[in-house]
Structure formats: C-alpha cells, structure tokens
Regions:
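Conserved ABC ATPase signature
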Residues: 148-153, 157, 417-421, 425
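ABC ATPase NBD coupling module
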Residues: 74-91, 109, 117, 239-244, ...
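A short, proline-enriched helix->beta-strand linker immediately N-terminal to the Walker B motif
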Residues: 168-172, 436-440
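ABC ATPase "signature
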Residues: 231-235, 243, 502-503, 511
Length: 538
C-alpha cells in the first residue's frame, strides 16, 4: 500500500538552540491510525505542526529532512499550494480550543469559513452543513449554538467545535493533537467512535497525538514513541504494549494512577456541610438585552465532607461540577446552605466572607492561565499571605520556601517566572499557592487534565502525601475517572446539575447503582479488559 504521509529524517530547531525534533522518520498509510506518544516537551506537537508548516519559520528552522504528502515535499511547497492542502486535504484538531477559536466570531461563522474557502458553500447550504457537523460531534440543540461565541461554551463543547471544523471538508489526513483532553469519558468515547466511523467511510488516515495510553491501546494500529525530540521506538500497538523494548516506553506504560486512597476515620462533625445548593444563571437576548430566563446549573445539591477526606465530583461537560466549586468560594451567586466547621457561610457578604477565604482555596485547571506571567514564583505564592496575613510579613519568605519544598520544588527557583517551568511544575506552583495559607479545604478543578500520565502520577502522589501530612480535605473535580478513583473517598455523580449517585467511592466504582453511573464507568477505558486484541483501527 502506498504511503499517504512520509516524514524522512526531519529535524526542527528553535533559534539555533537544542533540536526540538531530532532526525525522526515515520510514515502513515491511507486508512491507518498512527499514535505519537511521549511526555510534554518530547516534540510531538512540533512534529504535527511541521507537517502543515504552521511553525513560525523566523524562529524555527528545518535544517534537514522531508515531509512527503502523496509524494510531494511539503517543506518545499509554495504558500499557494499549502493553502490548498491546509483544511481540505490535511486537517488538524488543535490541542487548545480556548485559544484556537476566534473569540470575536460566533461558531457558525468559524465553521462556515472553512466550508466557503474550500468548497464554495454559502448561505443556507453552508448553514445546513454546519448543523450536520455539530450534530455529528454531539452538540445538543445545535441550532441554539450557531450564534454562540467561544466564551459561551464549556471546554468540552469548544473541543467538539474544533473537531467539527477539522472534519468539515472530509480530509484525507487528520492530525489530532490531544483531541479528547478536555472531554469527559462518555464524549471521549463518542468522538473516537465518530472518528472511527468517518475513517472507515472516507479511508481517512489519522495521526493521533495523545498522552492517554488507554486511548492509544484501544484505537491506534501503530505507535511511535518520542523522547527529547527523538523517536525511540515504533511498533504495532499490540506488540508495543505486550513487549516494549525501550526503557522510556516501559516507563510510560508503568505510569498508571495509583490504587484507591487509604480509608480515613469518619469524624463526628463534617468539615463541610452543603444542603440544597442551587445555582441559576441569567440568559439574555443579545449582548445588551434583557434577561429572558434563567439557566438552572445546579439543582438542590446536598453533600458532606469530613476532615482529611476527598470528595470526587464527576459528570459530563456542563453538568455543574465547576459551578459547585465556584459557589463554595462565593465566586458564583447561589442559594442554599454552606457550612464550614458549623459556621453558615451562604448568608455572608463578600467582606464578612473574606476571613474564611484563606481556609478554602482552589487550584484551577490551567496552571499557565492562572499564574500571572508578570510575577515571579515567590510573588505568586506570597500574594495570598499579603492579603490574609499582612501582620506577619517577616515570616512570609519562610512560608513561601516551606510551601515550595512541600510540593517538591527547589526554593532557589522562586525568582523565576511561570514560562520557565514545565506544565507539571506549574501545577505544583499552583498547589503551593493554595497550600501556603494552610487551608482546611482545597478545591481541585481538573488539576491533572493538561498533564501527561507520568506527571499526573507524580501530582496524585504529591496530593496524597500533603493530605496525609496536614489532614487536608479535597474536593476533586475531574472527568478522568482513573485519577478520581486514586484520590477519592466519596464520589458524587452529577448530570445536568442534579445528583445521580452519591456515596462511598469504592462502593460506587465496584457496583454502581444508577444506569448513568454505569455508562460513565463503562466509557472509562481503564474498565476495559487489558487484552492486546482490543485494538480497533480508527
């Protein structure tokens, strides 16, 4: 079978520094799925961007190599030819939908733009194709979403829009850079099965870039492993998982989340007691229009959390997980009762609530976006102390150093800035910022979703160690059920703002009662039997 894509001895340097991609060669045939795996910084995304010449060539050089698409070297192709290839013959699902979508254009305009450019579709024809694509990727009530802007969609919905745009012109090659990172397990399964169906219908080849080895095992036909810009191993999926030959590959395969946490004795009085929490958001007609109705995001949710325990909150995108976390911090208006150590917090105004903020901290999903690029690490970690502990400034530096040591970071690096750290290190900085105030409760909102498996495992072990040392309580919000299982003592399953199932995490993972919970667990790939014959080509 002829090769659709052949990368031959490709190297990429940035500003003549160390090679980001170092003499790699790989090929992809029509209808095949090749998974490109490796830790953050291994060169996976740089390789993908090189195929479509999307790197800034003032900073990136191509000293050697070829990228042959149907025998044509794209590295030598003129810009006019590249415009024909991009989006029509080769499409790409980018890793970060929050920054890949234009914030000034609505969803309809962004999808229709590629249809008009490559297929000449306009007006009702383009609109109908746009609706068809949104239905394909599982956007509910797509007619109401055509006029929405990116900021009005959840992370998972934005990712689905990106996938719809990539599939709009039925490309011969789809480059999928972490296509399911922001998606919950049921939508992950839907999207991957959609790609599988389209591949079978169109004979489309897929270059799948991911850090999720369970997805690789199930859907890729071949795997290429990258480390520090080099290709260290290539093999059929079943062969690589059964008998990896390179030490780095063995390290990746062994980086599974740890087992369930140790049991914690139940206390007489819960640290947190939430009763009938309710959140509604006003919806307006137009940018400056009047409020027409309210969207009911969280509906009469009740739960308790003991000191030293972790409550995992799971559910699909838009189920209300993050909204609950924001309501507990009074970042979102709510009704109902919220008690911390028996003190009613829901009726407090912002001024009265301020002393309680140091006792409830949050670690956000995106460590790069939540850390100020203009502040050093010491300034970031110290900021909370300057607000909540201004009378003891002499001890601030000591506390910053102690917090950085607690999360496994070198205090000598505290004068550096966020961009100088890896994704895993930035997440440790975010945890240190929360930890320095010695809180009772930390809300962890998707803290591991942007991290590869080896770094995920390190962060999980760090969180468990800190919890054991300080008796902290966590609310852990995630769509990754393997990580939730590793951390949670209790589990709360949400659907459309309503509790579906709530109780002991171990019991729910072993024997879920509700059908929706069963569907979630079935869709989570770690529940599938680890059999080499599971691999399904997409």
């Amino acid at each position: 079978m002829s090769k659709l894509l052949e990368i031959d001895n490709l190297s990429v340097c940035f500003n003549q520094a160390q090679r980001a991609v170092d003499s790699i060669s790989l090929s992809l045939q029509k209808g095949e799925t090749l998974a490109l795996v490796g830790e953050s910084g291994s060169g996976k995304s740089v390789t993908a961007l090189s195929v479509l010449r999307l790197l800034n060539e003032r900073h990136a050089s191509y000293p050697t190599g070829k990228i042959l698409y149907c025998g044509e070297d794209l590295l030598q192709a003129p810009e006019k030819r590249l415009r024909q290839v991009r989006g029509r013959e080769i499409s790409m699902i980018f890793q970060e939908p929050m920054t890949s979508l234009n914030p000034l254009h609505n969803i309809e305009k962004q999808i229709c733009e590629t249809l008009e450019l490559h297929k000449g579709m306009r007006g009702p024809q383009a609109r109908e194709r746009c609706l068809e694509l949104l239905r394909l990727v599982g956007i509910e009530n797509p007619e109401s979403r055509l006029g929405a802007y990116p900021h009005q969609l959840s992370g998972g919905q934005k990712q689905r829009v990106m996938i719809a745009m990539a599939l709009a012109n039925e490309p011969d090659l789809l480059i999928a850079d972490e296509p399911t990172t922001a998606l919950d397990v049921t939508v992950q399964k839907q999207v991957l099965e959609l790609l599988q169906d389209l591949q079978q219908k169109l004979g489309m080849a897929i270059l799948l870039i991911t850090h999720d080895l369970t997805i690789v095992r199930r859907y890729a036909s071949r795997v290429a492993v990258m480390e520090h810009g080099k290709l260290v191993e290539q093999a059929e999926t079943s062969v690589l998982f059964a008998s990896p030959s390179h030490p780095y590959t063995r390290k990746l395969l062994s980086a599974e989340p740890p087992d369930a946490p140790l049991a914690v004795a139940k206390s007489d009085k819960p640290l947190l007691d939430v009763n009938k929490l309710d959140v509604r958001f006003p919806t307006r007609k137009g940018l400056f229009g009047k409020v027409k109705e309210h969207f009911h995001a969280v509906k009469q949710v009740s739960f308790t959390l003991d000191r030293g325990q972790t409550l995992g909150i799971v559910g699909e995108s838009g189920s209300g997980k993050t909204t609950i976390g924001h309501a507990l911090l009074k970042l979102t208006a709510s009704t109902g009762s919220i008690k911390l150590d028996g003190q009613e917090l829901s009726g407090l105004d912002q001024s009265a609530f301020r002393p309680w903020r140091r006792r409830v901290q949050i670690v956000f999903q995106d460590p790069f976006g939540s850390l100020s690029p203009r502040m050093s690490i010491a300034e970031i970690v110290r900021e909370g102390l300057e607000i909540h502990d201004s009378d003891n400034r002499d001890s601030h530096d000591t506390k910053v150093v102690a917090a950085l040591k607690d999360v496994g970071l070198d205090p000598e690096a505290r004068h550096r800035y966020p961009h100088e750290f890896s994704g895993g290190q930035r997440q440790r900085i975010a945890i240190a910022r929360a930890l320095v105030l010695q809180p009772d409760l930390i809300i962890l909102d998707e803290p591991t979703s942007a991290l590869d498996r080896t770094v995920q495992k390190q962060v999980i072990e760090l969180l468990r160690d800190i919890q054991a040392r300080y008796g902290l309580s966590y609310i852990f919000i995630s769509h990754d059920l393997a990580v939730v299982r590793a951390l949670s003592h209790q589990l709360l399953v949400l659907r459309q703002g309503t509790i579906v199932e709530y109780g002991d995490a171990g019991q729910i993972f072993r024997a879920p009662v509700q059908e929706y919970t069963q569907e979630l667990l079935h869709a989570a790939f770690f529940y599938q039997p680890k059999d080499a014959n599971l691999t399904t080509t997409i």
